[in-house]
Amino acid sequence: MTIYALSSGSGISGIAVIRVSGPETREIITKMTSGSFPKAKQATLKKITKIDTKEVIDQGIVIWFPGPQSYTGEDMAEFHVHGSRAAVSYTHLTLPTILLV
């Protein structure tokens, strides 16, 4: 099972961090970003998009932590998006659509 959560705390902030962990993490990164897949443990600036329309949600940092060398032991990612309610909400709304497909 792949899980995701806001890890930086709720409320408006400069940056919000959403963590994803589980076997579908690689697929989530591929579907929500464009261009090349990020290198392991390297912060990469990416456009983060809705999967159905490819509308840009935000431009932020994506960090890929392949398992078992991640701190969860599974494939894991962090999406660092702007901390507005809109960016966080749209990212949270997009993640389950990937997991249900």
Model regions: which residues?
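A glycine-rich (often HGG/GG-containing) alpha/beta subdomain
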Residues: 1-95
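N-terminal low-complexity segments that are often proline-rich with Ser/Thr-Pro
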Residues: 97-101
